[in-house]
């Protein structure tokens, strides 16, 4: 009696020839028996007829999966068409409402979009549920594997999109549809204009915030600003869509108006502060008279407080000897006794009102400017302090007179003396010559002489000092005005031109 199946290895019941096998599998089919005879083992071997049955089952499962996916896609398309119709209906009705109702419509539109997004998620989850529950067989669990064979009898796999990736793709498609449907609307609708209506919060449900909080709306005093705000408060959402270009122009005009007003106010404040500073520093009660200028005008403050450009501008006012060997020469200038002594002279000029425009009633503003300009431009030949001290000494002299001495009464006159000559206009020859010693800019030594000439009280004005710089050369003429007599003599000064006066730099600051 011949052998009968089934095969102990593959399980088939029909075969052309039954063959012998190993003791654990005594009966084998033709294919398995041939494998045993040639190879001597049946490990990892599956005959072709067994593989064909498995492929048929796989094809059946694959057909069921594709069927469920197609049903899910059809449901998705139907829901997307419904959602698009709802959105178009809302967009058509939206411009009819006013601004208050427009906000509510925007919230409704947002809720609709949220519902559509959630609906797409639900539909996607439903499709996934259909995909997983289409077939109850155990082999259906392979649908959730990460790889699916792309060809028969191959081990090469390709990645399968997960449910999260599918949901992301659906949301991206929905976003593109919304953007394409809103192309007809102007881009100005994204700009939320300021409104005076009371609102619970500045956030209005769009994820946007108003440009200015309506609760903190500042009442402006300018009539132009109030008129612009009233125009904006009365405008509706339909006006915003139909006249968006005009609204942008109004906003631009208002921005330029506020910008111009701010710049003008800053310039006015800066000019006013500078003018007030000049009046305060040049008045009789200037704080420069009561402080120690050595703590302000020194080398350290010059380096710290001024920029490089400002330092260069101030260095141009110095003589060449003080600007050759920097910074050593500059430090020596600040620490020199002559520079420190001139502080008291400068404070004396301020206290007597030389730089006070309001106190000098007889002097014009042009004369003050000329006085300062001449003191700065030719400070090497400046005789400001000497001339000022001489005038003050003439005022303080006993009997309002100036004592002169003859040339022979002063023995051993040094070379750098100041020669003072007086000449009468109605006489041809010189009656008398006088000399006075000026050892420093602080004081003038007067010598008693044999005769005195009477002199009226001289009026000290910036014009009298400005006349010093009007003449070129080594001598200058001082003129006296006001109560001065017409037959006043001319006072001629012959001063050396090699002296530098740092107080000219201080005048520049005023």
Swiss-Prot record:
SUPFAM superfamilies: Glucocorticoid receptor-like (DNA-binding domain). A zinc finger (GATA-type) spans 1-55. GO terms for molecular function: sequence-specific DNA binding; zinc ion binding. It holds the Pfam family ASXH. SMART domains: ZnF_GATA. One of its GO terms (biological process) is regulation of DNA-templated transcription. Keywords: DNA-binding, Metal-binding, Nucleus, Transcription, Transcription regulation, Zinc, Zinc-finger. GO terms for cellular component: nucleus. Gene3D superfamilies: Erythroid Transcription Factor GATA-1, subunit A (3.30.50.10). Transcriptional regulator that specifically binds 5'-GATA-3' or 5'-GAT-3' motifs within gene promoters. Belongs to the type IV zinc-finger family. Class D subfamily. This is GATA transcription factor 26. It comes from Arabidopsis thaliana. The gene is GATA26.
